[in-house]
């Protein structure tokens, strides 16, 4: 490193990019990784300013997507909307969203002079590091999807997470934009005096949602005065049309609003959205109301970035498939594995609702661990409405380092006939054996078990490496 210290800034950047590109190619060749984070780590070791330099030298517009849930899918939707209009996109498509992963996008896409040719540089960034990463990227736009309980040992309580996001938003200059979920009271209140232009998205649709928040909802008190919020309509968890009886604060006027939602025969959703660019009719080929929110976020971001053409949006998402681990359907021999990444009560409950809408009794493999990546505080599992699953449950295998706690939670939910198998490969094989041919096995997994299951499936030839999708 002493020799590198005396190297000119331009040569240091070129060396960092070359080393990063080489490490990514080697990893893919040896099948030990897809170059989604290691190239960024190598490049940053040589030149800590590599991301900042590449971002500054690139002419494309730069967008950052952050928040608790929906980042990866929203990014893919926004990329599809841009590409439908002939706009080239560079993104961390595999969802590697820490600094190493974000830097790996720059390493992969830039030439050795440090310039990216893409017209839109689209970066999903973890909510805990966005305040550090955003200044390096200098984005034209930051979008915040939502704030839910997620890894409380890592983030602290919800307001700590909000402050992390707020720091990034406050640093945006006046010519930039911030796109916020207006249906999330905590997100909508972020950095009210920030100079950046503000746009809000959300739902304004009848026929969906409820009148009161579900019992595991996170933010149901006013951010200003802490009075319990009153809801005209709740669409998901604590997201909805709210007003505070105490101080009168309410949901902001929505710039992009989903006004009509209809289930489609393919399991997706047909939506109508009102936007400043006009009415948009669009088919969302992914299930669930949470994907309607992701679509609203993508539309708002596309308008903000100048990449929204209502006429092209209708079929822009037609080729979209679930991101890996998002109700991802995988052919596992003569059975179907449905892999779902669940990490907090909201994502878990939303996934369970989707599973329960499908016919037949359910065969389930639930796997959770408590590594630093997964989050060491697992108490949130007790707020998941697992009771709704029990009447339809045909078989259950639990796995991971927290298998015993999952088993205990299921016993309290009323289901005791389960297998506890800590090892992931044995658990997968047992769960598949308990699933009749032609029927689906639903895999509900935290981050580390999900990656482990996919590695097993990759070795068996059931899925390609995630970086090739």
Regions found by a protein language model. Give the residues of each.
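Short glycine-/acidic-enriched loop or helix-start segments at secondary-structure transitions
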Residues: 75, 131-133, 153-154, 189-191, ...
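Buried hydrophobic packing segments
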Residues: 78, 82, 102-106, 295-305, ...
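Acidic, Mg2+-coordinating active-site environments of NTP-dependent enzymes
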Residues: 60, 144, 148-335
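General small-molecule cofactor/ligand-binding pocket signal
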Residues: 90, 199, 283, 338, ...
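Short, surface-exposed acidic/glycine-rich loop or hinge patches that mediate macromolecular interfaces
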Residues: 68, 96-97, 276, 287-289, ...
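Phosphate-binding loop of NTP-binding sites
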Residues: 8-202, 207-213, 217-221
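Short polybasic/polar patches that bind polyanions
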Residues: 42, 83, 278, 303, ...
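ATP-dependent carboxylate-amine ligase
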Residues: 1-36, 219, 226, 236-248, ...
């Amino acid at each position: 490193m002493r020799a590198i210290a005396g190297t000119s800034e331009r040569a240091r950047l070129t060396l960092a990019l070359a080393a990063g590109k080489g490490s990514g190619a080697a990893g893919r060749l040896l099948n030990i990784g897809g170059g989604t984070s290691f190239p960024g780590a190598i490049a940053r070791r040589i030149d800590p300013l590599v991301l900042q330099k590449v971002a500054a030298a690139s002419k494309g517009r730069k967008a950052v997507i952050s928040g608790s849930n929906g980042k990866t899918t929203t990014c893919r939707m926004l990329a599809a909307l841009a590409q439908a209009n002939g706009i080239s996109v560079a993104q961390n498509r595999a969802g590697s969203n820490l600094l190493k992963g974000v830097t790996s996008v720059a390493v992969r896409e830039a030439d050795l002079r440090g310039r990216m040719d893409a017209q839109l540089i689209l970066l999903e960034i973890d909510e805990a590091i966005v305040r550090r990463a955003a200044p390096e990227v200098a984005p034209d736009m930051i979008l915040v999807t939502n704030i839910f309980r997620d890894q409380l040992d890592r983030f602290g309580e919800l307001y700590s997470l909000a402050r992390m996001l707020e720091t990034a938003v406050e640093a945006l200059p006046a010519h930039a934009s911030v796109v916020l979920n207006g249906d999330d009271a905590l997100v909508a209140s972020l950095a009210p005096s920030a100079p950046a232009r503000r746009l809000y998205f959300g739902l304004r649709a009848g026929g969906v949602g409820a009148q009161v928040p579900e019992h595991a909802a996170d933010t149901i008190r006013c951010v200003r005065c802490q009075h319990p919020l009153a809801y005209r309509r709740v669409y998901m968890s604590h997201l909805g049309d709210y007003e505070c009886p105490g101080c009168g604060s309410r949901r902001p006027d929505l710039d992009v609003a989903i006004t009509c939602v209809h289930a489609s025969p393919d399991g997706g959703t047909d939506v109508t959205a009102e936007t400043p660019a006009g009415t948009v009719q669009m088919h969302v080929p992914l299930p669930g109301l949470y994907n309607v929110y992701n679509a609203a976020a993508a539309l708002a971001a596309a308008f903000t970035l100048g990449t929204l053409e209502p006429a092209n949006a209708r079929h822009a998402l037609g080729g979209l498939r679930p991101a890996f681990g998002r109700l991802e359907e995988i052919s596992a021999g003569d059975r179907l594995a449905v892999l779902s990444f669940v990490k907090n009560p909201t994502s878990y409950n939303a996934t369970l609702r989707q599973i329960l809408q499908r016919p037949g009794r359910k065969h389930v493999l639930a796997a959770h661990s408590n590594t630093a990546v997964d989050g060491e505080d697992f108490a949130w599992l007790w707020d998941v409405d697992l009771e709704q699953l029990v009447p339809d449950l045909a078989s259950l295998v639990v796995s991971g380092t927290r298998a015993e706690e999952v088993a205990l939670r299921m016993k309290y939910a009323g289901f005791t006939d389960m297998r506890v198998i800590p090892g992931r490969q044995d658990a997968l094989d047992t769960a598949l054996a308990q699933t009749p041919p032609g029927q689906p096995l639903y895999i509900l997994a935290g981050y580390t078990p999900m990656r482990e299951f996919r590695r097993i499936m990759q070795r068996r030839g059931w899925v390609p490496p995630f970086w090739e999708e």
